[in-house]
């Protein structure tokens, strides 16, 4: 991409406290997917190799839902304090999305204030559902109302759907269930009226929106038919809602996927993401080269995906540009 100046909005990190919490819960994988090693030093080495200027770090699946309620607030605070410390040490190389102790709504509201007002993190990470409660559920209305008031940037990462059992098919959840769960979340966010009610949230979905680009018209028809919002949706409103989301291009580095995504949304809604360290390091450079060489993207469009769109979302990074 131009200038090899990528802003990577989909990158993950771990803290000692988070690793300890995973072990205490008996979790040694992400729904069958091995948990990789990570250090800031090794991440920066790879960023330099790949031409990534800044990574916005977040906790990946399984998020925090596995933690007992009594421990979740402290775990979220520890993770966010660690993220803020990394940013202080590497202000131009690192950004961060704050973890919230959901489904504890009061604790989450408190952590939003601390993370954005005190720690000055760049946004919030949420998950497609928390213990089976999908984003868009009325139980999370207070969270989205506050994020809307703040015009916050929110990155939504998928988790395994309720009832997932890897033994049924033999594949870890990230292989296919993650993109399906992103699609479910998008559908519920629109159908519940949350997108309509909270237009100021800047919400990024992972992996090119999952299966949404391919299923958009089918999903749209059924939101119009079964959507719970009042007044009812029109087909035009639903298609506009699809364009409201931002989409990272992680895992859409092949022609039919990117063509479908670009048919659904304009170029100013696309953001670069690597999914490091879960994505194999050997797969990241070819994915960068694919986006860089797409014939249907001109130089300005490539620059927008590389960093221009992200700089509009993250003023702290723009100040360092």
Residue ranges, per PLM feature:
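Active-site gating/metal-coordination segments in enzymes
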Residues: 58-192, 320
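Short, basic, glycine/proline-bearing loop/turn elements
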Residues: 25-31, 128-129, 239, 243-246
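Acidic-and-aromatic substrate-binding clefts and catalytic sites of carbohydrate-active enzymes
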Residues: 33-38, 64-65, 102-108, 131-138, ...
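Short glycine-enriched loops at secondary-structure junctions
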Residues: 11-13, 102, 158-162, 276-279
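Mid-to-C-terminal alpha-helical segments outside catalytic/metal-binding sites
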Residues: 1-9, 14-54, 81-89, 110-114, ...
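Hydrophobic faces of well-ordered beta-strands that scaffold small-molecule active sites
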Residues: 7-11, 55-57, 95-98, 124-126, ...
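H/E-rich (His + Asp/Glu) clusters that bind or coordinate divalent metals
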Residues: 164, 171-190, 202-321
């Amino acid at each position: 991409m131009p200038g090899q100046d990528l802003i990577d909005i989909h990158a993950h990190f771990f803290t000692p406290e988070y690793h300890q919490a995973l072990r205490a819960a008996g979790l040694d994988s992400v729904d069958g997917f091995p948990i990789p090693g990570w250090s800031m030093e090794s991440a920066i080495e790879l960023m330099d190799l790949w031409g990534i200027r800044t990574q916005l770090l977040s906790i990946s699946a399984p998020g925090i839902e596995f933690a007992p309620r009594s421990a979740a607030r402290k775990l979220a605070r520890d993770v966010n304090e660690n993220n803020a410390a990394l940013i202080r040490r590497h202000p131009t190389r690192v950004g961060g999305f704050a973890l919230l102790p959901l489904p504890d709504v009061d604790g989450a509201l408190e952590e939003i204030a601390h993370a954005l007002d005190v720690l000055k993190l760049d946004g919030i990470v949420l998950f497609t559902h928390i213990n089976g409660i999908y984003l868009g559920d009325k139980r999370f209305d207070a969270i989205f109302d506050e994020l809307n008031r703040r015009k916050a940037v929110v990155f939504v990462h998928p988790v395994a759907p309720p009832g997932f059992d890897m033994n049924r098919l033999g594949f870890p959840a990230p292989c296919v269930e993650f993109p399906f769960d992103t699609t479910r979340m998008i559908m519920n966010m629109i159908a519940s009226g949350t997108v309509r009610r909270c237009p100021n949230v800047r919400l990024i979905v992972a992996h090119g929106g999952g299966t949404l680009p391919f299923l958009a018209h089918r999903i749209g028809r059924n939101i119009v038919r079964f959507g719970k919002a009042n007044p009812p949706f029109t087909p035009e409103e639903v298609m506009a809602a699809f364009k409201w989301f931002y989409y990272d291009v992680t895992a859409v580095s092949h022609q039919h996927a990117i063509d479908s995504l670009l048919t659904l949304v304009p170029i100013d809604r696309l953001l670069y993401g690597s999914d490091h360290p879960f994505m194999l390091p050997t797969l990241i450079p070819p994915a960068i080269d694919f986006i860089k060489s797409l014939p249907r993207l001109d130089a300005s469009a490539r620059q927008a995906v590389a960093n221009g769109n992200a700089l509009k979302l993250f003023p702290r990074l723009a100040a360092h540009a």
